[in-house]
Amino acid sequence: MAKGKDVRVTVILECTSCVRNSVDKVSRGISRYITQKNRHNTPNRLELKKFCPYCYKHTIHGEIKK
């Protein structure tokens, strides 16, 4: 039986370079991915290198709050 809160939690990953570029100029959008993480194995914020269709390259996507 599981104790306390659920171990697996759904998180949203957002492109960090799109967020920085949207401040300077008009952006076409911000790339976001939805995934799950195990709270016991990775208690800190998740950062993964994923493909951003707006930047046309692989960039770092960081976890954001819901």
From Swiss-Prot:
GO molecular function: structural constituent of ribosome
Keyword Secreted: no
Main location: plastid
Alphabetized InterPro entries for the sequence: Ribosomal_bL33, Ribosomal_bL33_CS, Ribosomal_bL33_sf, Ribosomal_zn-bd
Highest taxon listed in the record's lineage: Eukaryota
Record-linked SUPFAM superfamilies: Zn-binding ribosomal proteins
GO terms for biological process, alphabetical: translation
One GO location term (cellular component): chloroplast
Keyword Ribonucleoprotein applies: yes
Keywords for this protein: Chloroplast, Plastid, Ribonucleoprotein, Ribosomal protein
Subcellular location: Plastid, Chloroplast
Protein family according to the UniProt entry: Belongs to the bacterial ribosomal protein bL33 family.
UniProt name for this protein: Large ribosomal subunit protein bL33c
Organism, as annotated: Nicotiana tabacum (Common tobacco)
